[in-house]
Amino acid sequence: MVDTRAVVGFGGGAEAYERGRPGYPADAVAWLAERLSLVPGRTVLDLGAGTGKLSRLLVETGARVVAVEPVEEMRRLLETVTGVEALAGAAEAIPLPDASVDACTIAQAFHWFEPVVALAEIHRVLRPGSALALLWNRLDEADPLTAAFTEVLARYRAHASVGYAWSEGFDRADFFTPIELRTFANVQELDAETIADRLASESSIAVLPAEQRRQALREVRALAPKTVVLRYLTEVYVSNRRA
């Protein structure tokens, strides 16, 4: 079952998500491609793919990219990404046969899943000897501007952030090996409009009453009178499939 906060929040904000969310740094993608052996002839599942922020980078590895996304508005944009096979579906019921993919990636999405059910499904579609990678772009609050952006987000968000509770799913299930973490620096250049899109892309902002949402967007626009940079830590978690 897809979390209704994700459906409501992302369904109405798919365009803002595509414009406002950062991509992933080249060194992170290169490490991921090597770690997951993403080469021509292999198939990678990008699960909860959104608008294809990671999917389009996976295409560059030469691997076949199958992307699954439950939110229709996000999937419409995903379908425009060259080289990606976009499917409707959820992590808890992946529309693929058993042992049909060589790797699975999940970017900015696993925290929305029912973790144990999703891990069982991912284990089912992965071939033996393969691996799962989870990615998040975390706002780096050591940077003053990024901290100011985060303060506005925290003050206005309509529901609490879904934090590191996602890892409990790995503790409760025995489908994958202990998680390996690599962290990479990431930067995003924004102006007044794209920093507003960045805020609007948060599901907890998208569901606010209209006037509150407008006020939050005014506040972040004021942070970017000219082109500015938000800083992130891109976290890549990798776990191998157990037999």
Language-model features: locations:
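Conserved class I S-adenosyl-L-methionine
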Residues: 1-40
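Nucleotide donor/acceptor-binding cores
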Residues: 41-42, 99
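A short SAM/SAH-binding and catalytic strip from SAM-dependent methyltransferases
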Residues: 102-116
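Conserved catalytic/acceptor-binding region of the Class I
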Residues: 117-188
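Conserved Class I S-adenosyl-L-methionine
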Residues: 166-243
